[in-house]
Structures are given as C-alpha cells and as structure tokens.
Amino acid sequence: MTEPYLPVDVVFHPNWWHRHYGLSFDRDFFYDPRRRVWQEQRMRQLLYERFGDLGLGQKDAPRRPIIGPILMGSGYIVQEILGCEIKYQDNGNPWVLPRNLSETEIWDLEVPENIEATPSMRALLALMEELEAEFGYLQGDAPLHSVINVAIDLRGQDYFIDLIENQALVAHLHQVIACTIYQVGRRVKPRTGSVAVSVNRIIASFEPGIFIIPNCSLQMISPTTYQNLLLEHDAWLGRQLPPLGFHHCGNNAHLFAPLYAHAGAVYLDVGWGSDIAACRAALPDAWLSLRLNPVRMRTATAGEAAADTEALLAAHGPPWDRTAICCINMDYGTGDEAVRAMFRTVARYRGERDSGIQTAYRLA
C-alpha cells in the first residue's frame, strides 16, 4: 500500500462549533450513545458543507459508533479515574480541577483495583457496549493523556518541587499513572483499533494504531529531568501499546526528539517554533506532523496562513515523505480563507499524490 503524501488536517475548538452551529460539549457529548452518534455525524456533515472542497467531512456522513471526541481532541478519563473532578462546558474543552494531593495522599495513591468499577470507566464501557450491540463494531478512542500531564493535575504545582527534592515520591506517582493509562488503553485499543486518534486525528491518514503520548507539559521541565524521571514510563507504555508516538505542542520539541527516538517513536507531533530539521535528524524514518499556530491562524489573512505553511515546509525541506501538516484547536474567528490557504499551499507541494484525508474520515 502506498503511503499518503503530505496529509493535512485541522481540528476546530469547541467554541468554534458552538458559535457557528450551536453545538454543545457537555458530558452527554462524551458518554451518551445517541448523542455521540448524532453529533459526530452532524459535525462531519457541517465540515463537508463548509470545507468539502478541501476534502474535509463527509457529504452523506453515516451514523457511526465513534466512542470518543476525535473531531475535537479532548477528554480526561485518566484524571477522572484517579479522582479529579472534570468540569464540562457547552463551548469549551472539559476542565480538570486539580486535586492538589498532599505527599501522604500521593503515597497512598494506587491504580484502582477494579478499574472497570470506577464511575468514568463504567460510563465509557457502557457506551462501548451499547454502540457495539447496535453497530457490531467500534471506532475512535478516548484521550489517555501522559504521565506528566496527569501528575500535574493530581499533585498541583508542588509536583515541580518534587521533581527536584522528592524523586522517590514522583517515581511512585509516575508508576501509578502509567499503569492506569495502560489499564484504560488495553481495554480500548483491541476493540477499536486505535487509542490516540483523539490526540491528533492526522494519524488516521497513515497509521491510526499509533499510541500518542501527549507531552504538552514538557515545556516546563528540562530534557535531563524528563530523561531521568519520566522517559522510562513513556517507553514502557510504548511497549505495551505499540507503535509509539509523541505529541509535543511546545516550541522545543527538538530538545526532546533524541529521547523520543530512544524510546522507539515512529511519530512526532512537532510544536510551532520547534527546530523541524533537528527533529527530522533525530527521527529520520518517523512521521512528523508539523503544527501551525492556531493563535496566529485566528487573525491570519489567507496570505499569512499560506506563508506560515510554506515556512513549515521549507524548514523541513524536501523530500516530504512521512511529513504531515496540521492546525489544532482553531477558535471562532479563524477565517475560512486562511484554512483554505493552508490546504492549497500543501496541495501545491503534494501534486497529484494521495493525501489520505478520505481514508482518515472513513476511519475517524
């Protein structure tokens, strides 16, 4: 099978959907079976009506048993399983309310003995059972987050002090989180075929089975700290749920790319402002997804959006094998012509080769 060439995709923030179309993203959007099916179908239809000329959405989108929010990429089931309160919103991603656990409470923290009995896991499994009973199969997944992201939500700002002064404590915390992530992932991936399309749906264009670890918070620690205290857990998760990829939305992905390579990464989501050439040098055979800046896109003219896209492609340089372009979480106010300029710029570089986008919308 020929690999797609220069896949490109976008994800719009819930506020964009809410302001344009009145769609809401309360808890029922995530867990009510009928609402899941209806809203995912409707979102695909709306994408086609607005951007069908770019390949987005589906004209006659079928009803499908998609278990997670793969058109917006949010969800915090691991945090919820480990006791965080989640605040759902009509026009935004869910908010995690940090637990700010004490040192004693962290030492007492354990992987739930019967994880399927936790309220959030019961809700997810019930959703999966009902959809599979109706359709005979399942698609999609629920974002599992990363060890560092969940650790901050559980411990709060004291986590950063612990990384220096209480490394035995963070070792315990990291182990509990990694095992919890795995316990969720192993119950999802065998039934849906994916476990991280909800982190960045661009992978549906080429390898939907990649397990992406979303290391959003690595911007706040050094590569040395990551290597010494977190890398082993990410690498372990990659061995349990292969193949392994990483999301790094910060502007310093190049500093961590050699460590990701050491962990066996086959995919890296490269944050805007990162040294793309250095990332490619560290991961010569991996897929790289080059991220545009959604804040810049919100006010960009078509010309500015095209220039930013050109800049990413130039920073990588030819050939663009195993290279993708995406812009994630674009908010209300982003101009349609800026989105079109992004896609048309990539299309000039792609030529007549297949982008994989229609495959992506069939799978995700």
Task: Please give the residue ranges for each predicted region.
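Membrane helical hairpin/interfacial module
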Residues: 35-86
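A gly/proline- and charged-residue-enriched helix-loop-helix capping module
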Residues: 90-126
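Active-site loop segments of alpha/beta catalytic cores
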Residues: 1-36, 42, 49-50, 67-70, ...
